Amino acid sequence: MEVFLFFGAALLLAVVLKVIFTPRSAKKVVMSSNPIDGIRFGGVMGFMLGDSYEFCLSRFKHLDIAIDYQDKTGDDSMIMGWGKNQYNNINAVRFIFEQKKLVSIVIDVDFSEEGIRDMYGILISRICRILKTEPMMSDSKQTAWASPKSGIILFKRFTPISGDEILLIQIGSM
């Protein structure tokens, strides 16, 4: 009888420890301090590539996220959420749909007001820390991370019209 009690207590302890120490999956991540901190392979802040157009619209509504416009079809369309001034250093997060499926997420990083000199290098370091992996390719204009199903690219671009430098983070399927 004592043996059964011992094994029962050990089993109960194992279950409790598993529940406490099991990390939450990326799908369960709802919000974080910033969209950059919410980057995962295949998604950002709970939105995942392949999610349906309707699901994303309902998620925007549920999370009370203001979006710029709604295309009723979801075919070859874009929704912009989290506009300027909602998060530090973020101009916008764009969700791109094809055939009613989320195919790409683009984060437009704003660093003009902060006056940070090497935001590109800082973002490379930050994304490496978040993803817990090094980039597969990096140069002075772009850096890429890859997983078997998706990839993340950090672009550094100069816009000739405004004379500003912009940084875009794109999450897409492989």
Label every model-predicted segment:
Residues 86-90:
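Amphipathic hydrophobic-ligand
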Residues 1-10:
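Feature marks short, highly hydrophobic, charge-poor N-terminal signal-anchor/signal peptide-like helices
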Residues 92-96, 156-157:
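Hydrophobic/aromatic beta-strand elements that line small-molecule binding cavities or substrate pockets
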Residues 78-85, 107:
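Short beta-strand segments that buttress and anchor functional surface loops
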Residues 15-74, 104-174:
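Non-cytosolic coordination micro-motifs
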